[in-house]
Amino acid sequence: VVMSVLIVSCKGKTGNTITVGSDKLDNTQSYFSESMHTVARCDTGYYYLDKCSASDDNLMFYDDKSEESIVLCNKPQCGHDGEECMAYISGSEFKSELYYYNSYIYMISSKGNLVQISADGTQRTDLGSICVLSGQDSVSMCFNDGYAYVSQEITGDIEGNVTVRLYRFNLDTGSSNKIYEETGYGIGINSLKTYGSDTFFLKTSVSKDDKGLYSLEGKGIFRITGEDTECLLDKNVYSYCIDADNNKLYYSGLGDGTIYEYDLGSGKSESIYKSDNDTGYFYITFDGNYIWMDDEGYKNMAMYFNKQSSSLDYTLYQLDRDGKLAAKRTIPDEEKIFSIMHGDSRRMFMFSFVNNKIVYIDKSNIEKGDIKELR
């Protein structure tokens, strides 16, 4: 691993003007969240991970045309229930994130190597080491122009300090460069995504007050060009997405329940949506047609960290590009949603503990459509 580390601060910067360039969303797949990345879009359907045991999965393919799923295994008379199956993904050998880029499936091994899987699932190729991982490290990945960009969050020490790192991995040569590293209390790298020709990420930090209550603070949006990292926007941001074709960035302010539109060409910012309840922030994505939001992160912080809620009813929001509310739907607690994964223009994906399955709602009828298992 070649080291080339930059620690960049957003302090004092109100925003840079850039042109992102056109976007191919099915290539960058920035319409998925990074919280539980177990679904990936390809030209003809979806690849996804389906539980075959408490800790292991099978690699599946859902075909748009037939509207059916198959296990990616061509062994005759295979029961698809163990390590002899070609589709078997061991929870001890792989991280749980699944990606698709330029006709291949990608996963990260528990050791920190990047593994390339053929579209039919028959071949797995170890491309080399991204970094050294421990069992508790969390990772996220996106792709840009023949490179994988990978974030690593190393579990905090007894004082609560966390180390975050970013790597740039060459898919052709297998070389990995560390391009960013920082250590601090409760810090994190989030929303590592590619839009147009550039890759972006968000920095956050968690603090705890004298009463034991936790609060989250955004440290700015950063842009990666090659191995260079710079602050793009110094705002208290929880989540962002970019409409690359129109050079507009949308972000959720932390604590004010407001969605802002930031013009990447002029540097001008304006609010376009204000929450009608006490929701302090939203996770947002853009699927090429609409801005999609959820309050999962806010509700989880309120319940698990600050004990301010006894149930987890999540709400999905569909906004036009100008911020007009097109649709809204509350997912009740009894659906046992663990993660809202978002998705392409067709479907909103989630993971449900009801049957430990990936479920979805057709985006064409987000308000009243059935919640269906992906199968």
Locate predicted features.
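Sec-dependent N-terminal signal peptides
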Residues: V1-V2
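C-terminal motif of bacterial Sec signal peptides marking the signal peptidase cleavage site
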Residues: L6-S9
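Surface-exposed loop/turn elements that mediate protein-protein interactions on large endomembrane-trafficking
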Residues: K11-Y31, D57-G82, G112-V132, E159-T183, ...
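Repeated scaffold domains used in trafficking and secretory/extracellular systems
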Residues: Y31-C42, D81-Y99, L133-D145, G184-G196, ...
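Short loop/turn segments that connect beta-strands within the blades of beta-propeller domains
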Residues: C42, S55, K65, Y101-N102, ...
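Residue position within the beta-strands of beta-propeller blades
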Residues: Y47-L49, M107, Y149-Q152, F201-K203, ...
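A generic tandem-repeat structural signature
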Residues: K95-Y167
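Loop/turn-rich, solvent-exposed surfaces of beta-rich toroidal or solenoidal domains
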Residues: G280-Y314
